[in-house]
Amino acid sequence: MDKIIKSIAQSGAFRAYVLDSTETVALAQEKHNTLSSSTVALGRTLIANQILAANQKGDSKITVKVIGDSSFGHIISVADTKGHVKGYIQNTGVDIKKTATGEVLVGPFMGNGHFVTIIDYGTGNPYTSTTPLITGEIGEDFAYYLTESEQTPSAIGLNVLLDENDKVKVAGGFMVQVLPGASEEEIARYEKRLQEMPAISHLLASKNHVDALLEAIYGDEPYKRLSEEPLSFQCDCSRERFEAALMTLPKADLQAMIDEDKGAEIVCQFCGTKYQFNESDLEALINDKA
């Protein structure tokens, strides 16, 4: 089961979140049938949103949009504060690797664009923030958002490793933040440790990558685990929700679906589930609108 572990240095100088998101990203790949680069880009976005959602309180809903002008198009993710996330990528078929190393490429195919967050607190006044994409690698873009919009300098690591068949092998990440009151000496020690950390891909390849991430972040510094919470890919779409959407259409449009298509099929963008509405279903909707 996927999870996020929240922890804090015993000194109170900084905190860290580490995530195992392997099942989340694997299910997203399965539902959207994404190729290598698209899988990694979508996976990183889902992990970023899992981190962002874990930082919220109450029943907030968090939307992350990574909008580029190159091959991927846009990537949309929606998460809640209960550990659920869903998402999709506009172009599922990007499959580009470095010839020499086989490394999956992401940044060069995101292009110029924006990292957009919408936090809905349920009050009717969602908070929206937009920052430019810095590298298109998503992790760096997320870190820039946290620094610029939330005024919280953060170290971020996100990645998805694929097997020889380009299926998700492991996915996860971390966030480290200095807390108010940290001394200059503590901040310097924290920065030095982060500079010396192995690459996120190396840590994820460890046998137990969650423990490997925590060890790399804290080193010999004492820390305590605050909580461990489950994470999952879960879509909240339903036939009733799409039926309500059809009810907003004019009668003429519903009648055209009956006359021309003998029904309607609606596909959820976030999870690919297909909902069929036959002629009788549409006629019932027309009668309900009468």
From Swiss-Prot:
Predominant cellular place of this UniProt entry's protein: cytoplasm
Keyword S-adenosyl-L-methionine part of the UniProt annotation: no
InterPro entries, alphabetized: Heat_shock_Hsp33, Heat_shock_Hsp33_C, Heat_shock_Hsp33_N
Superkingdom field: Bacteria
Oxidoreductase found in the keyword field: no
PTM characteristics: Under oxidizing conditions two disulfide bonds are formed involving the reactive cysteines. Under reducing conditions zinc is bound to the reactive cysteines and the protein is inactive.
UniProt keyword terms in alphabetical order: Chaperone, Cytoplasm, Disulfide bond, Redox-active center, Zinc
GO-annotated biological processes: protein refolding
Disulfide bridge positions per record: 235-237, 268-271
GO terms of molecular function: protein folding chaperone; unfolded protein binding
Protein's cellular compartments: Cytoplasm
Gene Ontology cellular component annotations, sorted alphabetically: cytoplasm
Functional description taken from the UniProt entry: Redox regulated molecular chaperone. Protects both thermally unfolding and oxidatively damaged proteins from irreversible aggregation. Plays an important role in the bacterial defense system toward oxidative stress.
Similarity annotation: Belongs to the HSP33 family.
PANTHER family found in the cross-reference section: 33 KDA CHAPERONIN (PTHR30111:SF1)
UniProt protein name: 33 kDa chaperonin
Organism name: Streptococcus pyogenes serotype M18 (strain MGAS8232)
Gene that this polypeptide is encoded by: hslO
